[in-house]
Amino acid sequence: MILTLIAASVLSGCGTTVPVKSAGNEADVVSQLVVARAQARWDALRKRDMDVAYQFISPAGRSLMSAEAYRPRVNSQFWRGATAKEAICAAETCEVTVMVDMLLEGVKFTTPVKETWILDAGKWWFVYQG
C-alpha cells in the first residue's frame, strides 16, 4: 500500500515516468523512482528551466527560499549534461549519485555529484544545500 502511494505520488510529479521492475523489491522500486526524479530535476537545470527545477526542492526548502531567490543561485553555464546513476536509500532519505558532464576552459570532464533526497508527505524531494 505504501509503495503504491509513493509510486503514484512520484510518478505524478513533473510528468516523470520510470519503468518499474515487476519482481523487484520495494527498495529497488523506491531507488528507481528517486533516480527518475533526480534526472528530471537535472534535465530542467540543463534546460535552464529554474522554475521547474525549483519545484523539486523540498517543501521546507521552498518555505525558506523563493523561486526568485533560487534562480540566480544556479549557474549552469559549465554543464553539458547529467545522468542520475543510482540512489542508495534508507527509510525516508536517499543519497543520489549524479554524473555531471562539464566543459571548463575547453576541458571536458565528468564529475560525480552527491544529492540528498527526502520523503515528505508521500513524495521524494531534493534537499537544497546552496
Provide a role label for each language-model segment:
Residues 46, 50-67:
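Short, solvent-exposed secondary-structure junction/capping segments
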Residues 14-46:
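Short, low-complexity N-terminal intrinsically disordered segments enriched in polar/charged residues
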Residues 53-55, 82, 127-128:
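Short, hydrophobic secondary-structure boundary micro-motifs
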Residues 71-114:
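Surface-exposed, charged secondary-structure patches
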Residues 33-36, 40, 52, 65, ...:
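Extracytoplasmic/secreted proteins, especially bacterial periplasmic and envelope-associated proteins
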Residues 109-130:
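Short beta-strand edge/turn micro-motifs at domain boundaries
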Residues 1-14:
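Sec-dependent bacterial lipoprotein signal peptides
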